Amino acid sequence: MKNRFCRMGKTLLGAACLLSTFGVTYSCSDDYDLPDTKPSFLGQSIYDELNKAGNFKTVIRLIDDLGQTSVLSKTGSKTLFVAPDSAYTEYFRKTDPNFTSLDESYAKLSINQKRMLLNGSMINNAYVLEKLTTIEGPVKNLCLRQTSASSATDSIPYWNWQDLPDNQNKGQKDENGKTVNADMRFWDKLRNEAHGGIYMALDGTNPLLTHFLEAQMNEKKIKNSDISFILNLDGTPEAWDDSETAGTRSYFYDARVVKGKQDVTCLNGYYNVLDKVLVTPSNMAEVIRTNGDTKYFSAMLDRFSAPFFDRSLTDAYKLLNDIAADSVYKKIYIAERSSMTSLTQGPNKESLNDFPFLPFDPGWNQYTVNQSTKEQDMAAMFVPCDEAMANYFVHGGGKVMIERYGDMENNEANLLHNLYQIPLNVIQPLIKNLMKESFNESVPSKYLTIMNDAQDPMFAARQYPSVDAYKANFKKVLLANNGVVYVMKSVISPATYASVMAPVLYDKSTQVVNTVLHADDAYTTDKYTQAPLRKFYSTYLLAMQSSFSFFVPTDEGLKNFGYIDPVAMANTGVKAKHAYWTFEPASVTAKDGKYLAIKAQGYPYDPTKDLDPANTRAKSGYQSLANEDLGNNWAQSKKFMLCEMIDHHILVHDNDDQLGVRGERQYFLSRNGAPVHVKSKGNSAGVGMEVEGGLQIDLKNDDQPANDQNITVSKVYDMTRQTNEYGNGTTYYINRPMQASQNTVYGAMQKQEQFSSFFKLCNDLSSNIGSSMLETLFRTADMKTNADWRKERNKYYIFADNAASSSDNPGARITATQMKLVRFFNAYRYSVYVPNNEAIDKAVHEMHLPTVQSIQAYIDAHTDENKKLDSVAKIKAQAMVVTLVNFLKYHFADQSLFVDQCTATTECQSACSDEETGGFIRLTAEQTPGKLNIVDVTGNTVPVSSSLNNICTREFELNSVATSARYITNSSYVTLHSLGDKFLLFSSKVKGDFAKAWETVGEAKAFAKKYRIKN
């Protein structure tokens, strides 16, 4: 084959060279005399060879009628796939209901039908079959589809108005009688009798020619039996198995190349004889619409479609055809990937910001897989037949949706109407789950690796133990020009319907949370940076191997109570700025931006009262409508608060923790690390459970009982795998949102009298005295600028400066006014174990723990009249500072731990390090029911106070100074515990007496080196 291909190339080259000499075309060969002979393998032109054969008269007629005679009878470069007249006779028997003869049926063909038959079976290049799997590069064995001579203008039908999609969706009525969740009715403008009809292409791109050839099949590990099943050959004499004797075959769509009739060499290319007429099928959406057994699914799919006017298509089609219409439309499915890239508006300029996109356009002829070319792959869809849809929605798992949204009795007679009433965002996960981007990876032999929307096996081995068992689930297979449609006998629910998101998706009382969960759905395959929230919550909550407790504030709670703005509260000195916000579902009509279909309204916050927007005048100017871009003004605050709220209401449990929040434990950490306290458990299902965040705990512990917030679970949905076989947790509806504490570690220590001595030690390091002392001891000659010195100085600080970080003040962090942040905490969860005043007094006066004041006094005592510090004293003073800083930092550790009803041992890292080991110095936390003990590195066990523990705080950094900030850039959630009159030791060296660290200059040097302050 390879030699013959090369031989023809040389022949045509020789012919071209001789043309100018002899005026005719010749080819090179060793066994002929010019100009009377040519190579025996080289025939006449394609046209002449077909004409001479005598049994391709229909093909010849097509060529003649379409004006291609001269093209195919002269030197050129074409490949044709032709069927004999007998095949055309069979073709017309099946397609012409009034068939009498081949000639009569042919005479009925329109010019467009003729174009489709000829152009779809012709490639505008000369290829032998074995080269058709090579793509540009060249890259061998990857090509599945070829660009043929077909064009989108070959057939653009005229559609009567009543044949256009008829969207029967009515939407739902909210409590005020307003229509909500209604479809965008893209077709209504054209679907009216007065308009008459339209010319509309099923897609604006040219269809390709799909082939199943050995080299590509081998490369992609596609079996003969896969193609046999796809072409519906199983059970027929043409069935193709995987045995060694099965032989090789070549198919173009479902037409097979006749053995011995391939690569017939002609002067201007090749032709291949097929066993049937090659007809380019329509796209997947259209074969689903027209096959007669998937009308319910097709109706739902068409709700995502819209007619778009196409000027270039209009002009091109009018050049070929005499039509009176001024406009030609193309049918486009609104999807993340389609021929219309970056689709943000509907055909009438409607905003698509909150439209639930499909993953790809099933009508896209030139469908392209991500990271691939259109020639290498196509799509696959798993579509339930009508009987399966009826069983699912009338009697099965989809019944709940019809009962929730349908407005007629749930029976098969009313099914189509009721299906239309299911909102698009609810039906979209079902459709999306059944759309697979790769044909190559979705063939039957690979069924165990086909994944659902949660990336779990869609066809589990326990249900489908063999390929044959898998195939038995299908009624038939439909081949389209851009993919394969597997028609199923059952409906496969998406993981979305089994996850903790499902109740929220279905429920009209949780639309605010649902909007946030799905805000980024249209950006999951690409364009990640353009997602409005960039949180991708629906993807996160589809982790079906996880176990979630998902707390959902209802729309009523978000409207009637609201959410305190932690950023506004950070401006502690200006009470007039303090605010809380309510959130309500809304519609987006704006275009070309990042929007969220939620209205936010601000109200003044009175810390002595509970939130009561119904009886409070809204703050003037404190509003963000759905049409406000999320990068602007209060929309930034809206985005931040809603994302923070969702993060705080998602809890992830260990997979072996089947009880979750209904178990013995009372304290849990949310997705973002914020604590959730289960105050009471409610009934056996969890209804009546009381929960609270750090803010609610703080409010109940203040002296204002009127401001208390009581949060109660009203509904519980068991979505666990233990109950449902497939699931990932439990969904709890609550009457209002939880919130994290607005206290910082600095503020919490400041408020607790028992912590005042420890707090003073921490704070003194960054005082004027402490800063001056540090400069005396640690500033070196190479620290020429203040920025150089401050970078070094900050290592010894516990609290960072409350200012914007800059080159002149690196390490500074903006937070609430009059507050400071723990310098070395950064977007994680931590605990601080605080010795009380008695413990610090013991450490200082009995064990000689240095303080800033005592170190400064030591420095002063060893500084001469020329203000020169004695070198030995300096080394010892440095060791004193290292001792003090490490003593303090050792009480700051990672992991938020609680005095709780649990038993666990946790290895924690403190904030101080050991230069010799190269790691952070550890401590061990031992939890038993109602107790928490800390074991320090010396082996000393210190119990956490039973009366002062579990103080929830939050370290938060603002995007700007508190007076103008809009959101928090990062947070750490920190739990404070009192150690009573005990403290922790970071080194055995200082056990009994801290002064051991600097008894001699050598010991001071070694100690300062081993425990040097690095960060």
Predicted regions and their residues:
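Mature, structured domains of secreted/extracytosolic soluble proteins
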Residues: F5-C6, T11-L13, Y26-N1015
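Hydrophobic alpha-helical membrane-embedded or membrane-associated segments
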Residues: A15-L18
